[in-house]
């Protein structure tokens, strides 16, 4: 049980809050309790303010033990106000924990938090910490953050994954291009575009001209047929075979057939094949998730917006009903 780690601290905080509550009642004030949380990579700073007065602050770990302590503190008050600055993946766990336990919260992006605190004349050199976040809530009275359905978060995660894979593909293409300049640069002219399943399979089969010239015409034709999963006519095969031989005769390879550069060329071609397949899988998942959403068909009806763009827009904007 995690309660054994938090009992003493929670009891102390509860006593402090009770004292402040009694003082507030004596003055006829309504008690407001604000939890300001400054989230870092490993831990978070928590500041608890009652009617603008700090009653407690501590550091908690960003794990089950730390969150259990926070939960114990939250349970000691009625309708606590929780405010924290979004710090990317680091604040994601805190947000998930609060969602799971049904607590409303206000999540600020870093620029928004800085702008708001600047307007309150907090010195720009001051670090935006938990206490400042909590203190500003008594002045700004921010609304709680709209909690989207899980499907929108999943779409955002898939959209970011798709973007990362696209960046990986661009890097791998650049590396393949550089390696081919040493072994067989003419091969980039075999198809209309040096990209796609057939091109990468041809690169794997023929990383330098020797692999072309060592084959008979029939063997070369068969390799070309195997380079694509699509149907390819005999005329097209013959054309590519003749062109491949011409490019090989034109080429001068800067390395020997046993050079590790050929292994590098094949590696990047295989990696591009794998990355492209994975990216298509992610896109299919995005489309499957987005199709039931009403905004999906609306976005597709706009000229120039296809499936990839539509799903990415939904992933980045989220549920537009929150605006």
Predicted features along the sequence, with ranges:
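A detector of single, family-specific signature residues
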Residues: 1-323
């Amino acid at each position: 049980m995690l309660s054994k780690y938090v009992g003493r601290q929670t009891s102390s905080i509860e006593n402090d809050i009770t004292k402040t509550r009694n003082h507030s009642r004596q003055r006829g004030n309504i008690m407001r309790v604000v939890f300001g949380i400054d989230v870092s990579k490993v831990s978070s700073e928590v500041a608890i303010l009652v009617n603008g007065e700090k009653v407690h602050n501590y550091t908690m770990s960003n794990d089950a033990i730390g969150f259990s302590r926070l939960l114990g503190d939250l349970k000691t008050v009625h309708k606590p106000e929780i405010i924290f600055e979004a710090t990317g993946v680091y604040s994601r766990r805190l947000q998930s924990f609060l969602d799971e336990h049904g607590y409303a919260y206000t999540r600020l992006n870093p620029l928004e938090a800085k702008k708001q605190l600047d307007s309150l004349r907090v010195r720009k050199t001051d670090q935006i910490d938990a206490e400042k976040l909590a203190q500003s809530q008594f002045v700004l009275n921010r609304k709680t953050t709209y909690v989207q359905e899980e499907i929108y978060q999943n779409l955002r995660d898939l959209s970011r994954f798709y973007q990362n894979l696209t960046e990986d593909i661009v890097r791998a293409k650049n590396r393949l291009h550089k390696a081919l300049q040493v072994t067989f640069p003419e091969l980039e002219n075999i198809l209309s575009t040096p990209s796609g399943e057939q091109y990468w399979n041809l690169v794997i089969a023929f990383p330098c001209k020797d692999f072309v010239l060592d084959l008979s015409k029939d063997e070369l034709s068969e390799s070309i047929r195997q380079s694509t999963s699509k149907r390819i006519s005999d005329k097209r095969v013959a054309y590519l075979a003749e062109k491949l031989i011409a490019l090989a005769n034109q080429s001068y390879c800067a390395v020997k057939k046993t050079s590790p550069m050929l292994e590098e060329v094949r590696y990047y071609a295989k990696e591009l094949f794998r990355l492209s397949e994975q990216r298509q899988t992610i896109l299919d998942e995005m489309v499957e998730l987005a199709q039931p959403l009403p905004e999906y068909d609306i976005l597709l009806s706009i000229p120039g917006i296809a499936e990839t763009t539509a799903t990415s827009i939904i992933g980045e904007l989220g549920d537009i009903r929150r605006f």
